[in-house]
């Protein structure tokens, strides 16, 4: 599986801080965990193993990458240790939006990982994971818990804060101009561009074409069933009102932190 086009390598570009549960020693730390890391091979300036390696071999080990800013992660790649036959064969992921409360990815799904030293295995996130920090928890391994990895995120310009889309929607076909009592008609609104997370939608009526019921104007609009792709606008009237048309403006706003 390939990395989504246009995504940013977070670890290689030092966009995230790294921490681990344990390190085998100072030469096997998180600084060596970047995908494709290779040591100098010069004995006079040995710069460590070609991976992060834990000092304890159990399912409580982890390596976490995080920051205080929200990112939309689109993929993760893993790789084994380049200078020994050690690699993680499966793992779980956990992530957090507030750096306090953690969530297991896909309800604790065990993700198949590597089978050799240097092959790269990539998993894409669809939809993207909105988080400040992500942790990888090795579950099974070959010889030792050792890995190199990379996290990929959307570039900042792809999700400016806040993201806003506007538009209008009308009844359009006089569906509510006859009959009595409660009557409704629904119009589905599709956003021009899909949001990354469910936005807040506000509506306001800008045009009313209707006949009163004994001097009373009875109509209402509601935004419902809001998703990242759109929402339903429900037009309502009641009594003896005849509503020929209503037009609403909408503003959809996505906040990312």
From Swiss-Prot:
<dbReference type="GO" id="GO:0030247">
    <property type="term" value="F:polysaccharide binding"/>
</dbReference>
<dbReference type="GO" id="GO:0007155">
    <property type="term" value="P:cell adhesion"/>
</dbReference>
<dbReference type="GO" id="GO:0016936">
    <property type="term" value="F:galactoside binding"/>
</dbReference>
<dbReference type="GO" id="GO:0046872">
    <property type="term" value="F:metal ion binding"/>
</dbReference>
<keyword id="KW-0479">Metal-binding</keyword>
<feature type="region of interest" description="Linker">
    <location>
        <begin position="156"/>
        <end position="162"/>
    </location>
</feature>
<feature type="binding site">
    <location>
        <position position="218"/>
    </location>
    <ligand>
        <name>a carbohydrate</name>
    </ligand>
</feature>
<feature type="region of interest" description="Lectin-like">
    <location>
        <begin position="163"/>
        <end position="257"/>
    </location>
</feature>
<dbReference type="InterPro" id="IPR052487">
    <property type="entry name" value="Galactose-binding_lectin"/>
</dbReference>
<dbReference type="GO" id="GO:0005829">
    <property type="term" value="C:cytosol"/>
</dbReference>
<feature type="binding site">
    <location>
        <position position="39"/>
    </location>
    <ligand>
        <name>Ca(2+)</name>
    </ligand>
</feature>
<keyword id="KW-0106">Calcium</keyword>
<feature type="binding site">
    <location>
        <position position="47"/>
    </location>
    <ligand>
        <name>Ca(2+)</name>
    </ligand>
</feature>
<feature type="binding site">
    <location>
        <position position="238"/>
    </location>
    <ligand>
        <name>a carbohydrate</name>
    </ligand>
</feature>
<dbReference type="GO" id="GO:0007010">
    <property type="term" value="P:cytoskeleton organization"/>
</dbReference>
<dbReference type="Pfam" id="PF00754">
    <property type="entry name" value="F5_F8_type_C"/>
</dbReference>
<comment type="subunit">
    <text>Homotrimer.</text>
</comment>
<dbReference type="GO" id="GO:0098636">
    <property type="term" value="C:protein complex involved in cell adhesion"/>
</dbReference>
<protein>
    <recommendedName>
        <fullName>Discoidin-2</fullName>
    </recommendedName>
</protein>
<keyword id="KW-0597">Phosphoprotein</keyword>
<dbReference type="InterPro" id="IPR008979">
    <property type="entry name" value="Galactose-bd-like_sf"/>
</dbReference>
<dbReference type="GO" id="GO:0070492">
    <property type="term" value="F:oligosaccharide binding"/>
</dbReference>
<dbReference type="InterPro" id="IPR037221">
    <property type="entry name" value="H-type_lectin_dom_sf"/>
</dbReference>
<dbReference type="GO" id="GO:0045335">
    <property type="term" value="C:phagocytic vesicle"/>
</dbReference>
<comment type="function">
    <text>Galactose-binding lectin. May be necessary for the primary process of spore formation and may be involved in spore coat formation.</text>
</comment>
<dbReference type="InterPro" id="IPR019019">
    <property type="entry name" value="H-type_lectin_domain"/>
</dbReference>
<feature type="binding site">
    <location>
        <position position="209"/>
    </location>
    <ligand>
        <name>a carbohydrate</name>
    </ligand>
</feature>
<dbReference type="GO" id="GO:0031012">
    <property type="term" value="C:extracellular matrix"/>
</dbReference>
<feature type="binding site">
    <location>
        <position position="40"/>
    </location>
    <ligand>
        <name>Ca(2+)</name>
    </ligand>
</feature>
<dbReference type="Pfam" id="PF09458">
    <property type="entry name" value="H_lectin"/>
</dbReference>
<dbReference type="GO" id="GO:0031982">
    <property type="term" value="C:vesicle"/>
</dbReference>
<dbReference type="InterPro" id="IPR000421">
    <property type="entry name" value="FA58C"/>
</dbReference>
<dbReference type="GO" id="GO:0046871">
    <property type="term" value="F:N-acetylgalactosamine binding"/>
</dbReference>
<dbReference type="GO" id="GO:0005737">
    <property type="term" value="C:cytoplasm"/>
</dbReference>
<dbReference type="GO" id="GO:0140582">
    <property type="term" value="P:adenylate cyclase-activating G protein-coupled cAMP receptor signaling pathway"/>
</dbReference>
<keyword id="KW-0430">Lectin</keyword>
<feature type="short sequence motif" description="Cell attachment site">
    <location>
        <begin position="81"/>
        <end position="83"/>
    </location>
</feature>
<feature type="domain" description="F5/8 type C">
    <location>
        <begin position="10"/>
        <end position="154"/>
    </location>
</feature>
<dbReference type="GO" id="GO:0030246">
    <property type="term" value="F:carbohydrate binding"/>
</dbReference>
<feature type="region of interest" description="Beta-sandwich">
    <location>
        <begin position="1"/>
        <end position="155"/>
    </location>
</feature>
<feature type="modified residue" description="Phosphohistidine">
    <location>
        <position position="84"/>
    </location>
</feature>
<dbReference type="GO" id="GO:0009617">
    <property type="term" value="P:response to bacterium"/>
</dbReference>
